[in-house]
A protein has these predicted regions:
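Positively charged n-region of N-terminal signal peptides that target proteins for export
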Residues: 1-6
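Feature activates predominantly on carbohydrate-active enzymes
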Residues: 35, 89-329
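Acidic, contiguous N-terminal accessory segments
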Residues: 21-143, 337-338, 342-344, 359-360, ...
Length: 502
């Protein structure tokens, strides 16, 4: 049998292949994202995907999804109780064995079975030689796999311009790429019953829509985490836009915000905390009571409110975060927040890294409850060390490393997270959830978080991009898309005329 052996520590593109014997001329391996820890697949020997053996715990989920993916050609699902008790396997660990006798999945949990099925879907192709699909085949071989980082998350923004299908597609892609958490940040788009004025009138992030997305996420094995900004970014809008999702339409609520642009919440106003606590409880319940809640906390301004300025701001800041954290803890969740306001700008220890805090906020941070999770964001290229991560870890906090769209940075930060033993990685997307950025972010992030020590290409070339497009197309089938605008990664194949460079 002619095999490709994927030795991931010396990976070239998605795989580096060492082939026993002569491979078929021009044969191209199918890509698996994220890269499995160990994978050996044939280039030429295939098995019909008409029967699969799984443990009892995953039986109903597997049967449902195979029917959804493959319709009348769905493989028969067989339960083997002998593979259910894989005591040596971790909760997310699986093994796939494909030979002439069929396909067997070894795993001990539903989540691991899900991951095995996502892998199989990426390597299954229609039987050849027919006009329409009449069956499926998979390459023979063996895959053994498990994640190297525990918390593998992505941060998704829901802007006023964002349509619900775009959020759903990102959730589905994150789950397909074996991420286990997705933070959903509303940018004035959550329709609140507690404070109907707090957001844009045409908000699309309704409780009904969240319930629908949560059901999808739960089924696919990814947990949704809500976010409300409780310090800076109170405008729920990008700074460059100059908008304020509350005050532009409802100026009577100005006392809740700092006078300077309303960018900060007013921490000295007791009504501010009362409102935020009510909003947090509402959002937490809308998201089905998840284990975490993100409170933002980045890029705040110095106080312009005379009441805030006249008080020891370090104490005001500390009391505010303590109260918010106590509310979240009482709900049964842990607080997550960005790091940049927690260290002092001008401190030479942080030169070259993201620092927006003052002496006051840095001092207040030292007294924070240690159950808060610090989300350390850095969006530039690879660094040999990340002193801010080390600092927060040394202070006794759980830490997540948070890259954005720099491929080298995503890889380096994921490797540093793995090496330093912190909680994990939370990749960010911001307003780059379409076009060329989408394949770059999700491909690099998924691979770096799952198997950080593997070689991962920093050049998202046509081959890699096309494989991501293939996976996005599969997600489009799951979403039963009909609108051509919802296909691919660009809304339009040719940009509008003013943007054409003739």
């Amino acid at each position: 049998m002619q095999y490709i052996k994927y030795a991931f520590l010396c990976l070239l593109l998605t795989f580096v292949c060492s082939v026993e014997g002569r491979a078929t001329s021009g044969a191209v391996p199918l890509a698996i994202y994220p890269q499995p820890l160990s994978c050996e697949l044939s280039l030429t020997e295939y098995t019909p995907f008409d029967r699969i053996v799984v443990c009892a715990e995953g039986h109903s989920w597997v049967a449902k999804h195979l029917k959804s993916w493959y319709g009348k050609c769905a493989p028969q699902v067989v339960v083997d109780d002998n593979i259910a008790n894989e005591s040596a396997f971790g909760d997310e660990e699986y093994e796939i064995i494909i030979d002439s006798e069929g396909i067997k999945v070894r795993a001990r949990s539903l989540q691991a079975v899900r991951y095995a099925l996502y892998t199989l879907r990426q390597i299954a192709i229609p039987s050849r030689g027919t006009e329409q699909v009449e069956g499926w085949i998979v390459p023979q071989g063996r895959i053994k796999d498990k994640p190297q980082i525990e918390f593998r998350g992505v941060h998704i923004c829901w802007f006023r311009e964002t349509e619900p299908w775009e959020v759903e597609r990102q959730i589905r892609l994150a789950a397909y790429y074996k991420m286990n958490y997705a933070v959903i940040e509303s940018w004035g788009t959550f329709k609140s019953d507690v404070a109907p004025w707090f957001g844009w009138p045409d908000a699309t992030m309704t409780k009904r829509e969240i319930k629908r997305l949560k059901a999808i996420a739960d089924d696919l094995g990814i947990t949704l985490i809500p976010q409300i900004n409780v310090f800076g970014h109170a405008s729920q809008a990008r700074g460059y836009a100059g908008k304020h999702a509350a005050l532009d339409i409802n100026p009577r609520y100005q006392p809740l915000f700092e006078p300077l642009a309303g960018w900060n919440w007013c921490l000295s106003n007791p009504e501010t905390r009362k409102l935020l606590q009510a909003l947090i409880k509402e959002r937490y319940e809308a998201f089905g009571c998840p284990p975490y809640f993100h409170i933002g906390g980045d890029e705040a301004h110095q106080p312009s409110c005379p009441d805030c300025a006249s008080k020891p701001y370090s104490q005001l800041f500390l009391e505010h975060i303590e109260a918010i954290n106590e509310t979240i803890s009482s709900l049964g969740a842990r607080t997550m927040m960005w790091h940049d306001m927690l260290i002092e700008r001008g401190d030479s220890r942080w030169q070259g890294f993201v620092v927006n805090g003052s002496k006051e906020t840095a001092a207040g941070f030292l007294k924070f409850p240690r159950d808060i999770i610090i989300c350390d964001w850095y969006y530039d290229g690879a660094q040999s060390a990340y002193p801010t991560i080390d600092y927060f870890k040394e202070q006794g906090f759980s830490v997540l490393s948070c890259p954005w769209n720099n491929t080298g940075g995503i890889i380096a930060q994921s490797r540093y997270a793995h090496k330093s033993g912190i909680m994990g990685v939370l990749g960010t997307t911001w307003h780059h959830y379409f076009g060329g950025s989408l394949p770059n972010i999700y491909y690099t992030l998924a691979n770096a978080m799952w198997n950080p020590e593997a070689h991962i290409s920093t050049s998202v070339n046509d081959y890699i991009r096309q494989m991501v497009h293939t996976h996005i197309r599969q997600i489009g089938w799951d979403m039963k898309l009909k609108n051509p605008r919802h296909a691919g990664t660009y809304y339009e194949e040719i940009p509008p005329e003013p943007f054409l460079n003739n």
